[in-house]
Amino acid sequence: MANYFNTLNLRQQLAQLGKCRFMGRDEFADGASYLQGKKVVIVGCGAQGLNQGLNMRDSGLDIAYALRKEAIAEKRASWRKATENGFKVGTYEELIPQADLVVNLTPDKQHSDVVRSVQPLMKDGAALGYSHGFNIVEVGEQIRKDITVVMVAPKCPGTEVREEYKRGFGVPTLIAVHPENDPKGEGMAIAKAWAAATGGHRAGVLESSFVAEVKSDLMGEQTILCGMLQAGSLLCFDKLVAEGTDPAYAEKLIQFGWETITEALKQGGITLMMDRLSNPAKLRAYALSEQLKEIMTPLFQKHMDDIISGEFSSGMMADWANDDKKLLTWREETGKTAFETAPQFEGKIGEQEYFDKGVLMIAMVKAGVELAFETMVDSGIIEESAYYESLHELPLIANTIARKRLYEMNVVISDTAEYGNYLFSYACVPLLKPFMAELQPGDLGSAIPEGAVDNAQLRDVNDAIRSHAIEQVGKKLRGYMTDMKRIAVAG
């Protein structure tokens, strides 16, 4: 099979990369009705599989779970989760032939095996659904021409998909129809009904493409969402300890600092995050972020280039074929880092202290968010897609670090995201070491003293922060998410 994106000509590539339309709420007036009375079978009962299924059932849809015979016979976790929640569970052979919509919510590396197993069992004219398009775009999976292929991609972990639905809301969602597989022209109706059944239409839905979702998703998770947080955690911890900070305090400042900082980011973008600083600290954070952007631009561009060309995917799939040797080695090495093994700090760190003593961390967030956004947009991805794959998801990933450090982040994210995270962080850490050596007192671990500031300089910095394109599009998109709850757990 050939990488689907690479089979397209340049015009087709640009058209699919640039497909992005914010859908009006009136387009979801029929809710999930298009799928009511039809049989929906979900393959996979992980975080997305279970929580999407719960939402869809609560929206009036007929949901069942198809699992491998071994998973049922051995009563594995997927079987237990589905049965304990009252769902019908059966083998592929028992459930797939009757399904009107088969939703594949297994991990990326299992998609080819799953699709090749279920496709011969699917009835003529059925639909196949994904929540991430890697299998279609990067693997180039060929789907029977009578099958409609759609995607509904919530821009949050599965647990958030469920919690927001229970509150009567939802999470922002991308939907798409694979242009090679829409024989009856009903793909968009299916995708809209599925998105409505998960509650996504209440928070905002983007009509996108499989290509745009995959390329932007890979870029976001490799750089700002996971790679930058991992590299920043390791660099900042080592810097603090080297300068005499108690390792336990340093660990807590970083572990919970990302979450506290990005909670402000979630509520009001980079503008609000920077406004939490004193004026002297804001000017310093801005200067540091500009330095970081200059240093890291080639690295961000390399990741985007390798994602667009398919180089990243081919390398990762080669590691899949080699029993994840690289991935497992990097995972083990990360677990042995000083940050991961540092003792816990029993004292309390106040919310403002995370900002005052984390100027460098704020600069890293600002630089990483803006660079990821800019690099995606420069590659033809529309601003709304770039926003969701950079700034929007960052607080959710930071929340995983607050739970159990980098270990938890790498457990929660997909293997695809974890592999890309390691590629980025292993390159970024040595790249930034000279920069770290030149830091000034007050950049990290201590507060910058109050002092006089130049009014014109402060005005210009404020204007630069607020006029960035990600702040403009973010303000619009956050208007649809004002009901989302705070997710911070730091005390």
Swiss-Prot record:
It catalyses: (2R)-2,3-dihydroxy-3-methylbutanoate + NADP(+) = (2S)-2-acetolactate + NADPH + H(+); (2R,3R)-2,3-dihydroxy-3-methylpentanoate + NADP(+) = (S)-2-ethyl-2-hydroxy-3-oxobutanoate + NADPH + H(+). Its EC number is 1.1.1.86. Its cofactor is Mg(2+). Mg(2+) 1 binds at residues 217, 221. The active site is at 132. GO terms for biological process: isoleucine biosynthetic process; L-valine biosynthetic process. NADP(+) binds at residues 45-48, 68, 76, 78, 108-110, 158. Gene3D superfamilies: N-(1-d-carboxylethyl)-l-norvaline Dehydrogenase, domain 2 (1.10.1040.10), NAD(P)-binding Rossmann-like Domain (3.40.50.720). Involved in the biosynthesis of branched-chain amino acids (BCAA). Catalyzes an alkyl-migration followed by a ketol-acid reduction of (S)-2-acetolactate (S2AL) to yield (R)-2,3-dihydroxy-isovalerate. In the isomerase reaction, S2AL is rearranged via a Mg-dependent methyl migration to produce 3-hydroxy-3-methyl-2-ketobutyrate (HMKB). In the reductase reaction, this 2-ketoacid undergoes a metal-dependent reduction by NADPH to yield (R)-2,3-dihydroxy-isovalerate. This is Ketol-acid reductoisomerase (NADP(+)). It comes from Salmonella heidelberg (strain SL476).
